[in-house]
Amino acid sequence: MRADRPIGTFLLLWPTLTALTIAGNGKIEIYLLIVFCIGAFLMRSAGCVINDYFDQDIDKKVFRTSTRPLATGKVNNFEALSLFVFLLSLSALLLIFLNFLSFLVATSLAILVSFYPLAKRIMKIPQIVLGIVFS
């Protein structure tokens, strides 16, 4: 989940809060601020979990990532996937506070979050997927 490294959540929040500010003519409703802050944390965490799941064999060989829980065996595949589903489920619960268009966008982005680790294997520039997710 990398909760100890909040920079990823902040990177997700930057464009989100900018869009909310523009959409609200300079004002962000407090409930939207709460929903989107929690959502950014949950989805960034879900993205980290699924990325670590798909990259665990690579992570074992790279010094920077060799201590990640899946790479070391501290967490098994079932636990990681269960956490991923749990984080996605919590994120989905947040959608009850938003409109249908937000639901469609969020669902599409959840698919892209799940696809990014695989995109690294089949695309020359998988950062495009991340760029779409982060925007």
Q: Which positions does each model-derived feature cover?
A:
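Hydrophobic alpha-helical transmembrane segments of integral membrane proteins
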Residues: 2, 11-12, 113, 122
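Residue-level signature of catalytic and energy-coupling elements of molecular machines
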Residues: 1, 55, 126
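The first (N-terminal) embedded transmembrane alpha-helix
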Residues: 3-22
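Membrane-embedded alpha-helical segments that form the functional core of polytopic membrane enzymes
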Residues: 16-17, 21-54, 64, 88-92, ...
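Short, cationic motifs built from Arg/Lys/His that form the positively charged side of catalytic pockets
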Residues: 2, 65-68
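Hydrophobic, aromatic-rich alpha-helical transmembrane segments
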Residues: 5-9, 25, 29-33, 37, ...
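Intramembrane alpha-helical segments
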Residues: 68-135
